[in-house]
């Protein structure tokens, strides 16, 4: 009873009430009585008394004591708890050592510090009592599989190829492995201490940048419920930034602060949009448009892509009014001006009344064909109109246009809503002025093109057409004309064109040098009509065709002469070979006749009468 603090209590009576002294002499005592072996599932964990102290293990493994301490001894309790936490491990059937510890002992006990897999199995059976009766093939499949698993899993074991052929590899201890509890290979790709340090430094750098930009950037877009992580995400190392950090959209949020997890933190005030949403009115009192953003918008709207898009829309919207003869000429396209002073001077949006001309273009005029339908253009244009742009529904430059009832309703709604802020109204008027000036000039260009297309072709006079820098690629024209085989007729009654004909050399003509025959230019002194030019072209084509025919005939004649020469050569060779063959045949016949002369029968046959 060395392992117990006190002796087990003695039982005086059994469950049936019989005294233990009465049963002591009747029971046979076996001196060699040993505990019977049980299955592993019933072996551990075994129930132990509360004051049990475990004895020392065979393999010098230590385990903290589970003995309860007195409540007053707090210092000793803390030390025992730390020791128990440090040395605690899962208790196996053979002790506290794991499979990796047993394999380490096996390899370390070898003379050359290396063992094969079969030698490790043998060491387990010989040195660990639990595996002594489990060396056969039936009961060793489980623990042998665990040993193979631990050999390939832990970093402390290293596989070395065996020098002999057909032999298993050696397993050795890795000298570079870290001491203590080994790190599994599967966990090596996960977060390590080095990765944690690097990520921590990156977090600190980002937090410092956020704190530095809170004062300047958070004031630009005020939001009562927005946080730094939601509105001030910077990437200083990004190649996109120039000068300052690249700021993401204020609506962007990280995964941790998504809309689903931070519904109460969303701001009721919309963030600043570079492109306004035409379906909803924009609150200009809560947003500030910088001059850089305004210039970027003006440059974007002045590109050719926007011109083509707006021109297409204007052609669709004003197709009904393109044939009106009473329309005045439209002004050319003028790029938007950036100076604020000029914008205020040229602004048609004054509180007194609208300015005359094209500046009072109404958005309702863009949907003349959609007037009878439920078009969305009407409703989208209502939100961005000022009172001055809505009052005048008929422009003096367009006497045929119809007044719109929708614009009057919109104006009444604006008046009933109350007076707006003067500063916000000025900003809104300036932006609408820029947009409408662009649409007006583009509309004028498109309508001018449509009106020009409506004119008859007879009014087009080439004499009044400026031909100072007019040039024509004659080579492409001639090639296209020749591709039709000379059947294309050009009978357009146009005026004369100043031409300069460059005469070609006296040599043979070809398609490559036809381009040198004519060069239309404004500096020429001779005038030829289009019919004369067509006649010259046909004549040149005929000459070129004749020249090609002559060349083809010459080539054919040369080919025939070459064939005749070949035939003559073949005939000469054939005659000589024929003579030689005839001589050979004649000599053979003579020899045969001489050989067969003695056997010639001179008498007639018997049946001849």
From Swiss-Prot:
Q: Does the record's keyword annotation contain Ribosomal protein?
A: no
Compositionally skewed regions (Low complexity) per UniProt: 80-89, 336-349
**GO molecular function annotation:** DNA-binding transcription factor activity; DNA-binding transcription factor activity, RNA polymerase II-specific; RNA polymerase II cis-regulatory region sequence-specific DNA binding
A single GO CC term for this protein reads: nucleus
Q: What Pfam families does the database record attribute to this sequence?
A: Forkhead (PF00250)
Q: Locate the Phosphothreonine modifications and list their residues.
A: 43
Name the domain of life this protein comes from: Eukaryota
Residue numbers of the DNA-binding region are 94-200
Coarse class of the protein's main subcellular location: cytoplasm
Renumbered to this chain, the Pro residues biased-composition regions fall at 326-335
User: Which of UniProt's keywords are assigned here?
Assistant: Activator, Cell cycle, Cytoplasm, Developmental protein, Differentiation, DNA-binding, Growth regulation, Nucleus, Phosphoprotein, Transcription, Transcription regulation
InterPro entries hit by this protein: Fork_head_dom, TF_fork_head_CS_2, WH-like_DNA-bd_sf, WH_DNA-bd_sf
User: Which positions carry Phosphoserine?
Assistant: 74, 189, 258, 261-262, 267
The answer on whether this UniProt entry bears the keyword Cell cycle reads yes
The annotated regions of Polar residues compositional bias extend over 62-79, 220-229, 255-264
Q: Which residues form a coiled coil?
A: none
Q: Region entry Disordered: which residue ranges?
A: 38-89, 181-204, 216-264, 316-358
Subunit structure, interactors included? Interacts with melt.
Function of this protein?
Transcription factor involved in the regulation of the insulin signaling pathway. Consistently activates both the downstream target Thor\d4EBP and the feedback control target InR. Involved in negative regulation of the cell cycle, modulating cell growth and proliferation. In response to cellular stresses, such as nutrient deprivation or increased levels of reactive oxygen species, foxo is activated and inhibits growth through the action of target genes such as Thor.
> What's this protein's name?
Forkhead box protein O
The protein's organism comes out as Drosophila sechellia
